[in-house]
Amino acid sequence: MDVNFLLSALPEPYAAFRPIVDVMPAIPVFFLLLAFVWQASVGFR
């Protein structure tokens, strides 16, 4: 998808939240890493 289309699709009142919206697709990856770190801390039981 075109980046300009994604940025223009966000309504103006929500322009302040644009950086958060840009990070949102990576959140599931953080949960995957969190699960790995958690299992490493408990010794992969």
UniProtKB/Swiss-Prot annotation:
Keywords of this entry: Chloroplast, Membrane, Photosynthesis, Photosystem II, Plastid, Reaction center, Thylakoid, Transmembrane, Transmembrane helix
One of the GO BP terms on file: photosynthesis
GO terms under cellular component: chloroplast thylakoid membrane; photosystem II reaction center
SUPFAM superfamilies, A to Z: Photosystem II reaction center protein K, PsbK
Locations listed in the record: Plastid, Chloroplast thylakoid membrane
Membrane topology: Single-pass membrane protein
Domain of life per record: Eukaryota
Pfam families (alphabetical): PsbK
Keyword Plastid: yes
Segments passing through the bilayer: 20-40
Propeptide residue interval(s): 1-8
Principal location: plastid
InterPro entries: PSII_PsbK, PSII_PsbK_sf
Assembly, per entry: PSII is composed of 1 copy each of membrane proteins PsbA, PsbB, PsbC, PsbD, PsbE, PsbF, PsbH, PsbI, PsbJ, PsbK, PsbL, PsbM, PsbT, PsbX, PsbY, PsbZ, Psb30/Ycf12, at least 3 peripheral proteins of the oxygen-evolving complex and a large number of cofactors. It forms dimeric complexes.
Family from the record: Belongs to the PsbK family.
Entry-linked NCBIfam families: PRK02553.1 (NF002715)
Functional note: One of the components of the core complex of photosystem II (PSII). PSII is a light-driven water:plastoquinone oxidoreductase that uses light energy to abstract electrons from H(2)O, generating O(2) and a proton gradient subsequently used for ATP formation. It consists of a core antenna complex that captures photons, and an electron transfer chain that converts photonic excitation into a charge separation.
The protein's name: Photosystem II reaction center protein K
Classification of source organism: Eukaryota, Haptista, Haptophyta, Prymnesiophyceae, Isochrysidales
